[in-house]
Amino acid sequence: MVSSWRVQQAAREIRAGAVIAYPTEAVWGLGCDPWNEDAVYRLLALKSRPVDKGLILVADNIRQFDFLFEDFPEDWIDRMGSTWPGPNTWLVPHQDLLPEWVTGQHDTVALRVSDHPQVRELCALVGPLISTSCNPGGRPAAKSRLRVEQYFHGDLDMVLGGALGGRKNPSVIRNLATGEIVRPG
């Protein structure tokens, strides 16, 4: 895959510990490297979000999450795979394979394989990313680059331009083990 110059620049920034904003399927997102503790805590501070709530990981394809699936029943993997890429987020057991600054106080972690072209390009270059709505706590998620700038006044390392994917609502969130819908889409 040949990535655009701006996506390559965003990948370099993320590898260096940046927190960036980028368009997703429905709203603008904030993202960073999930393994970079400083970057994740900076993102949480920007949002005024407590670490115990946990965060979503977004990827280019299901294989980027293979390290989590070693002991999963095959039907779980098939269930997720049949809904990806797309607006479906699954809560899956993390088996202590992810840091607590990603999982919060939960035994599960939220995973999604995006169908947004820029998000997929970016994840193809850097692997799974933290992806959370671009807004300070209690405010509506940004639906425009202007709103991103108004919310964060230059506190982000980069804003990756582009268009939203056209969805009206964020992804549905389901518990993989129970099938329960935790958040409708």
UniProtKB/Swiss-Prot annotation:
Signal peptide: none annotated. PANTHER family: SUA5 (PTHR17490), THREONYLCARBAMOYL-AMP SYNTHASE (PTHR17490:SF18). It comes from the Bacteria. The keyword Cytoplasm applies. Keywords: ATP-binding, Cytoplasm, Nucleotide-binding, Nucleotidyltransferase, Transferase, tRNA processing. GO terms for molecular function: ATP binding; double-stranded RNA binding; L-threonylcarbamoyladenylate synthase; tRNA binding. Belongs to the SUA5 family. TsaC subfamily. GO terms for biological process: regulation of translational fidelity; tRNA threonylcarbamoyladenosine modification. It catalyses: L-threonine + hydrogencarbonate + ATP = L-threonylcarbamoyladenylate + diphosphate + H2O. One of its GO terms (cellular component) is cytoplasm. The keyword Manganese does not apply. This is Threonylcarbamoyl-AMP synthase. Required for the formation of a threonylcarbamoyl group on adenosine at position 37 (t(6)A37) in tRNAs that read codons beginning with adenine. Catalyzes the conversion of L-threonine, HCO(3)(-)/CO(2) and ATP to give threonylcarbamoyl-AMP (TC-AMP) as the acyladenylate intermediate, with the release of diphosphate. Gene3D superfamilies: DHBP synthase. Its main location: cytoplasm. Its EC number is 2.7.7.87. It is found in: Cytoplasm. Residues 4-185 form the YrdC-like domain.
